[in-house]
Amino acid sequence: MKEKLLRAVRAKHQAKMEEALVNIEVYEHSVGIGEHPDLVEAVEAQVDKYVHALEMVEGVNSILGEEH
């Protein structure tokens, strides 16, 4: 049960990482420019989300003994 819960947490944060990367890609194209006048701040927020999610994934991997 513990392993399933940890794998679910890892999957959740892997999805958050992917979401942040997609958002950054959108900001790199004209679609996102009109909505966010401060693109640097918007991208920085996505990088912060990505890094937090990555740390969570790495933490779960460490707990499970699956460090990659």
What are the language-model segments listed below?
Residues 1-68:
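Extended, charge-rich alpha-helical interface modules
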